Amino acid sequence: MPEGDQGAPPGRRVTSPHRGLRRATTERAILECVAAESGPLTRAELARRTAISPPAVSEAVRRLEAGRVLVAVGPRSGVPGAVATLYDLAPGVGVVAAVEIHRTAVRAAVGDLLGRMLETTDHDPPRDGHDVLARLHEALAEVRARWEARGRPLRAVAVSIANPVDPATGRVVELHESAFPAGVLGADDVRGVDPAMVVLDNDVNFAALAERDHGAATGAPSFAYLHVGERDSVGLGLVVDGVLVRGARGLAGEIGYLPLGGGSERFRFGEAMAAQGLGAGEDAPDEAGLATAGRMLGEAAVAVCAIVDPGMLVLGGPVGLRPGLLRHVAATVVELAPREVPVVAGALGGTAPLRGALAEARRRAWEGLVSARG
């Protein structure tokens, strides 16, 4: 009896456990290849790009087409030789959504699994901290109804919130002067989506991921994203060797709580920043206020450099990108950092948290799509 068939019922074929893994690996490679392209591909093109044998690619494409994951969209035109069929992601695979929640705004975005943003919408902000869940459900209900009516179900959701999120519990953490109360939202509170397909994280973390993937930090394995947001809230997203650092309780990067001064003059860094009047809705500060704020941000950045040695510093957020602030931050870093560290402006502006969240929802959807076929 062949090895592996011992104990099998007569007449029943035993499949190697490695076969399913090979199939899943091939399908993942094909789907990742489709995701990386702006247009559909033929089986031959998929085989060349993935370096997988044409027969294995053809078999995988047949499985994906039968499972309504890929769809034939027509022949390849304008090339010599036999007519080849193009394949693209099937619309029925669905869409992903991201929702960004702040005290003053709720924004939603919908994208497909190929990385294209399909729409953005604005929604009523929460009346208070306990209204967050209701606003989230309203935004997602609108998104779900609109896209399911088009035959495109909601596959994954990412929620960006202006609070830390405990990675162990998946729930919002409350700190002094943070936007929302503790536990106001958790990943398991999102309705109508498999909990495994829900991501909840801090807005600065999502912004850092967006700058890593599509912004100023593209290609940088280690960097620090320094974010100055609404009401002069200050946070840091830290990426080391390509991985976002969250900390044991999701508090990594909460530099607004750095203590400054001494004795009776002791105060928090975030409070000192707020005193400079740099708010996004305020008039432009005078040069002295800008220089003071830039100096404080630069000193905080130098402390980060001394501990984690990032390859670059990215300054972002609606307040962090105010004209003139960057040069003061950079000058302080040049003066005080142990080694030279480039300081650059974020490339994505105020869209960074929402774009980062949408990309994370898409990543989760891809994982679910492939694992469901493994």
Go through each PLM region and give its residues.
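Short secondary-structure boundary segments
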Residues: 161, 228-230, 312, 317-318
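ATP-binding/phosphotransfer module of carbohydrate and carboxylate kinases, centering on a glycine-rich
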Residues: 1-75, 79-122, 131-142, 260-374
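Glycine-rich phosphate-binding loop and adjoining helix at the ATP-binding site
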Residues: 122-222, 269, 324-335
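Conserved phosphate-binding catalytic cores of ATP/NTP-utilizing and phosphoryl-transfer enzymes
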Residues: 75, 79-96, 198-226
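Glycine-rich phosphate-binding loop plus the immediately following alpha-helix
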Residues: 188, 195-196, 200, 204, ...
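Short glycine-aspartate micro-motif
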Residues: 96-100, 154-158, 223-227, 235
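Short beta-strand scaffold segments in enzyme catalytic cores
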Residues: 106-110, 209, 234-238
